[in-house]
């Protein structure tokens, strides 16, 4: 449909979906912010490697959601359509930051999910070496994590971008870019999604296999929570990777426009499933993060959720040395400094 605005009979439903996505998305942004602050506040007592990886991943997720929600989903509704077309209908560099962020962030998030899975696998499979490796090279791993996505989208950086009517959807605008190099961004994104999705899955399975060799009855609630966190992260990553793979398959292999339309409708939810739940899983599973968040909300609402005695007790636990049983367990000795984080 070559129209600035979606059909009137669809507009109310689209606005409802947009508002719903905005509500849970912005709420997740707030939770992510508190999670990051909690990890920074307790950085002396928590696993610095995980805290750094999670913080980077959260920052990328926040950037990608705000970029995707405030621009792409906004223009799909046709708001200010004529003004945008008049000013940005021709290729220009003003709109290219959106395309660059929209291409870079999801790949970077995939990479950091794989790094978190690698961190967990190395700590479980080889605790002492894993601890030494991540303590020594965590900043290098993070730097590499930010550079790897450029391999899959560098060719988009010098391109110009422009707004055009969405001729394949239900109206509204789309933002495209003018190619400088004859490289398919869809293919690169699909390869990255499948590659790092499978890598995250393999590392998670490796972690579970290593854990299976231990006495599962000796696992603490903290470690079980940590396993649940990674399993959820892997599932969300695979949902996004599968969606990206099917999208490329529908467009370039079978050229099934009906399948493409169905996948695109689901893709916005797949993106949210991919980038937002890590805020909630850490909040629900981590006692430290949850305690900090409740205390922060309590100060703003004038309510004391936790007494001073509980805070003192928690602080004593967080700095207490490892117990004998903890020292004997090669897994419990380091995972997120489990007794502190969970």
Curated annotation (Swiss-Prot):
Question: Where is this protein localized, as stated in its record?
Answer: Membrane
Output a single Gene Ontology CC term carried by this record.
membrane
Transmembrane residue ranges: 11-31, 51-71, 106-126, 140-160, 191-211, 222-242, 269-289
**One Pfam family, short name:** Srg
The alphabetized list of GO BP terms reads: sensory perception of chemical stimulus
Membrane as UniProt keyword: yes
Instruction: Tell me the protein family, please.
Output: Belongs to the nematode receptor-like protein srg family.
Name of the protein in question? Serpentine receptor class gamma-69
Organism field? Caenorhabditis elegans
What is this protein's gene name? srg-69
């Amino acid at each position: 449909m070559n129209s600035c605005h979606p059909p009137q009979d669809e507009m109310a439903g689209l606005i409802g979906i947009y508002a719903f996505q905005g509500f849970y998305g912005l709420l997740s942004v707030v939770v992510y912010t508190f999670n990051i602050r909690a990890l920074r506040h307790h950085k002396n007592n928590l696993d610095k490697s995980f805290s750094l990886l999670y913080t980077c991943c959260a920052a990328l997720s926040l950037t990608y959601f705000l970029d995707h929600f405030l621009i792409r989903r906004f223009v799909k509704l046709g708001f200010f359509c004529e003004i945008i077309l008049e000013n940005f209908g021709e290729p220009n560099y003003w709109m290219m930051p959106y395309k660059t962020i929209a291409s870079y962030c999801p790949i970077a998030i995939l990479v950091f999910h794989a790094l978190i899975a690698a961190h967990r696998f190395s700590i479980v499979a080889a605790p002492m070496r894993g601890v030494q490796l991540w303590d020594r090279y965590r900043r290098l791993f993070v730097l590499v994590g930010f550079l790897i996505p450029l391999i899959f989208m560098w060719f988009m950086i010098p391109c110009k971008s422009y707004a055009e009517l969405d001729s394949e959807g239900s109206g509204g605008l789309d933002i495209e870019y003018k190619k400088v190099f004859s490289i398919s961004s869809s293919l690169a994104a699909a390869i990255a999604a499948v590659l790092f999705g499978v890598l995250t899955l393999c590392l998670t399975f490796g972690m579970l296999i290593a854990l299976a060799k231990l006495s599962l009855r000796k696992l603490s609630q903290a470690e079980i929570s940590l396993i649940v966190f990674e399993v959820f992260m892997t599932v969300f990553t695979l949902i996004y990777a599968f969606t990206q793979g099917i999208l490329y398959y529908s467009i370039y292999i079978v050229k099934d426009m009906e399948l493409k339309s169905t996948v695109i409708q689901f893709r916005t939810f797949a993106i949210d499933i991919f980038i937002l739940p890590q805020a909630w899983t850490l909040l629900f599973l981590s006692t430290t993060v949850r305690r900090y968040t409740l205390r922060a909300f309590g100060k703003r609402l004038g309510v004391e959720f936790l007494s001073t005695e509980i805070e003192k007790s928690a602080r004593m636990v967080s700095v207490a040395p490892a117990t004998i049983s903890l020292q004997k367990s090669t897994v419990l000795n380091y995972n997120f400094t489990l007794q502190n984080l969970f």
